[in-house]
Amino acid sequence: MDNEMIAGTEAFLRQTFADSAYFRNNPKDRDYRLEHSYRVANIAKNIAEAEGFDVAHAVIAGLLHDIAYCEEMVTREDHMNHGRRGAEIARPFLEGLGLAPDAVNEICYGIAIHVDDRADFEWERTPFCETVGDADNIYRFDAYRIYETLQFIKFSEMSLDEKKAKVTGTIEKLNSLKEMKLGTATAKNLWLQRLDYYIGFYEKMMAQFENSTAIL
């Protein structure tokens, strides 16, 4: 793995975020996006190591996949386009690293399609390219996101019946997500591990709720 190239990418990402007028006015968003980028890059690294992909390229793609968030996103279209815009921002930097044109295109294609599976340039949809979106999706089911989700939906303010209904629906949705296709066997295994972790958590929560109104 080319640690010097990765260090340069980290510096580029941090500087881009530091130069962002939007992030200067929204430092919490900046901090979250940076932390998220590292988490996705580490998942991409794990997939690349297991699948025999270029690990440095996978880490770079993970670090830069959300770089477009340096720009304020007002509309839903802005958010849907942030993969393509991110690839546009990343390309000159990647070319400056001296990467081969095919490597630049593959990284940029992975960044471009990670939101809605669409790019604005032609390239082969390789398992490497799918790794960016797969890593991003796997991240959505890490431990901290449980806390964030419950806080966002104001779970603590719900009645017991509302909590039970929400947890039941969540478990059903999590089980349905097991059928989702991913680009590699490694990503699929990580995906299933995360889903099982979540299902186990919510099943334990439901068991606690069942013990909350009567002696069983």
At which residue positions do the language-model features occur?
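Acidic/histidine metal-binding catalytic segments
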Residues: G52-I60, L97-I111
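Acidic/His-rich, divalent-metal-binding segments that scaffold phosphate/diphosphate chemistry
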Residues: M1-G83
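An active-site-proximal "capping" alpha-helix that borders the catalytic cofactor pocket
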Residues: V40, N81-G96
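Short helix-capping and hinge/turn segments at secondary-structure transitions, especially at repeat
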Residues: Y69, R91-E95, L99, A112-D120, ...
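Divalent metal-dependent phosphate-bond-processing catalytic cores, especially two-metal-ion Mg2+/Mn2+ enzymes
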Residues: D2-E4, K28-F53, L64, D116-L216
